[in-house]
């Protein structure tokens, strides 16, 4: 059976899940392996942050993963579709597809087409339903424009283009099926290398990107969530779940976290935070056996990431709790903590919707601040840690329409809704998203060693000024630096010019195949390399910038590839294009250095001149927003 044949059998599993009738299959007819699943009622909003939901989802994806053959997998999935909760089904089947060897090359269809109601405002969905009813024929095209979810009375609405970006929200959902918190290597027979560190780094970068765009729109940097008793800002998502028929709950301004009787108390959250911070201060954590595990420079961040999330790899979840996941659930249920009003939770309960809420970023900056407490215990990098002897960056230029000027603009795209919602025919939603003109890095390098050298090229971008126009100090600026690319380059003796297109970024996914493309066999390949559509959307590679041009610094650093690379990574690993945030499938993370190096630790140098070594370059660039093109 070809990959294309497998893909065509997979796709119907994901279609029209919002229209399923309740309890379609008689449980007595189901496969005996599925007898224990189906506990979460259909129509309930599934949350991979909720431990009970996650427990059942894990049972299902492990059953599907262990299916004897591809035919057996399809058989089980088809039955499970009629038994289990809709969101739980998609989560578990997606995890299984990404990790089964006989599904290599098969692509999970885009979550925004499976559940368009998680991405498209309820007003727009309603408009689409009315337009569909009016059309005379299924061949007649229906195109509706997306509705705005706020106005200028709310300053945060300036960031709606970022928070509500379909690609960004899909990325967050996809990352969490690539790295399920309950992943058990002893059961799944595959190790997720540096999973805890990836949890830290992906979310840290998301916060840095969000702050860069806040500065681009004239807003101040976000204020981290820091107090479990603080009153939260209001938020209304304008989303309605079609599987439950209820809205994703709004959050009135002024509410604060309250105990969830059936889940977690506010005091638990405060206690877990204090235990984590204390362990960071003393330099070790206590595992389930009472042993002291050091938070060293090499593995400490990975250990801490597992504790904070908390994942199956947590060394002691009884003591350190479940801070990150529980926070998501508490904020999602802040309006109805004891369930007396039988309301849906808010968008913070779901990985495909939580980026829409401003509190997501404030909460993750709170989480990141705990990671930064650990990073502050590590020694600052010395010159010897940063240098690449005999290699000097002579010049670096961003080649675009104008040198060192990157243009951004709002671009129109469409989303097909008819695979997720039952319509007479195709129904598309037109929406706008940020995009940028393509550009190329040109890096002039001199290799004076007399030998061929192999280098890791690391490219970051960071703003130069704060919201008041003051110059950012380097140690303050480092938390704003966003990774743009990381790749291998060969340096001949003498002068070299390294060129690299922005579209080749190790951070981004270039294109996510649509349902229709997958049905035609496009984007289906056993050698596909994007793990697997997990990367940050390419159109959001750089911040928005300003109309007059916003000042940024492009940082380029070359390090010794022989010291950096991990031997098991041969550059051809399946699903490795967006490796910076997503890792490489069934392989070790291909860079020995800390994620975010060299900006992951405190920088004592007050100026660029004091920090810079010959293998570094700081280039002034502008990002200019052109509104529409």
UniProtKB/Swiss-Prot annotation:
Q: Does the keyword RNA-binding apply?
A: no
The residues that hold Cu cation 2 are: 324, 328, 364
Location of the protein in the cell: Secreted, Extracellular space
Disulfide pairs?
Answer: 534-582
| Binding annotation for Cu cation 1 | 172, 176, 203
Q: Which keywords are on file for this protein?
A: Copper, Disulfide bond, Glycoprotein, Metal-binding, Oxygen transport, Secreted, Transport
Single GO molecular function: copper ion binding
Under which name does UniProt file this protein?
A: Hemocyanin F chain
This chain's source organism reads Aphonopelma sp.
């Amino acid at each position: 059976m070809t990959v294309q044949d497998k893909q065509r059998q997979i796709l119907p599993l994901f279609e029209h899940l919002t229209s399923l009738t309740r309890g379609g299959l008689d449980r007595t007819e189901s496969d005996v392996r599925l007898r224990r699943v189906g506990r979460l009622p259909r129509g309930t909003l599934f949350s991979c942050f909720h431990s009970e939901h996650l427990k059942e989802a894990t049972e299902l994806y492990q059953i599907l993963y262990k299916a004897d053959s591809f035919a057996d997998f399809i058989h089980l999935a088809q039955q499970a579709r009629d038994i289990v909760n809709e969101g739980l089904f998609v989560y578990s089947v997606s995890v299984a597809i990404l990790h089964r060897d006989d599904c290599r090359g098969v692509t999970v269809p885009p979550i925004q087409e499976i559940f368009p109601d998680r991405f498209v405002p309820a007003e727009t969905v309603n408009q689409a339903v009315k337009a569909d009813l009016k059309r005379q024929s299924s061949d007649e095209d229906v195109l509706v424009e997306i509705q705005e979810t706020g106005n200028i009375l709310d300053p945060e609405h300036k960031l709606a283009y970022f928070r509500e970006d379909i690609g960004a929200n899909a990325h967050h959902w996809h990352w969490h099926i690539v790295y399920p918190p309950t992943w058990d290597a002893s059961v799944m027979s595959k190790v997720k290398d540096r999973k805890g560190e990836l949890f830290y780094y992906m979310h840290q970068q998301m916060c840095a990107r969000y702050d860069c765009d806040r500065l681009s729109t004239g807003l101040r940097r976000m204020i981290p969530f820091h107090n479990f008793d603080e009153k939260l800002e209001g938020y209304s998502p304008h989303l309605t779940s079609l599987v439950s028929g209820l809205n994703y709950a709004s959050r009135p301004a002024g509410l604060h976290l309250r105990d969830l009787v059936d889940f977690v108390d506010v005091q638990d959250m405060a206690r877990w935070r204090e235990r984590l911070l204390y362990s960071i201060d003393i330099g070790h954590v206590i595992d389930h056996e009472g042993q002291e595990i050091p938070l060293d420079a090499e593995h400490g961040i990975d250990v801490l990431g597992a504790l904070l999330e908390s994942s199956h790899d947590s060394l002691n979840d009884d003591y350190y709790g479940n801070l990150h996941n529980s926070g998501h659930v508490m904020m999602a249920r802040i309006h109805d903590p004891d369930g007396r009003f039988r309301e849906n939770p808010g968008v913070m309960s779901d990985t495909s919707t939580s980026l829409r809420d401003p509190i997501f970023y404030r909460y993750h900056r709170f989480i990141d601040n705990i990671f930064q407490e650990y990073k502050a215990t590590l020694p600052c990098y010395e010159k010897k840690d940063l240098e690449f002897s005999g290699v000097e960056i002579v010049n670096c230029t961003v080649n675009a329409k104008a040198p060192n000027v990157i243009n951004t603009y709002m671009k129109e795209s469409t989303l097909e809704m008819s695979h997720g919602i039952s319509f007479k025919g195709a129904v598309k939603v037109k929406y706008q998203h940020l995009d940028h003109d393509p550009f190329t890095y040109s890096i002039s390098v001199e290799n004076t060693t007399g030998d061929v050298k192999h280098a890791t090229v690391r490219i970051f971008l960071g703003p130069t000024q704060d919201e008041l126009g003051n110059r950012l100090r380097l140690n303050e600026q480092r938390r704003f630096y966003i990774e743009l690319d990381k790749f291998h380059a060969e340096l001949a003796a003498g002068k070299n010019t390294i060129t690299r297109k922005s579209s080749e970024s190790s951070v981004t996914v270039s294109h996510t195949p649509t349902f229709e493309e997958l049905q035609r066999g496009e984007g289906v390949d056993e050698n596909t390399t994007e793990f697997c559509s997990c990367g940050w959307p390419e159109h959001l590679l750089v911040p928005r910038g300003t109309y007059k041009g916003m000042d940024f610094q492009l940082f380029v650093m070359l390090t010794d590839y022989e010291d950096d690379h991990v031997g098991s990574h041969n550059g051809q690993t399946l699903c490795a294009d967006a490796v910076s945030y997503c890792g490489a499938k069934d392989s070790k993370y291909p860079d020995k250095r800390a994620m975010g190096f060299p900006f992951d630790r405190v920088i004592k140098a007050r100026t660029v001149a004091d920090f810079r070594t010959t293998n570094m370059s700081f280039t002034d660039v502008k990002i200019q927003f052109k509104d529409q093109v």
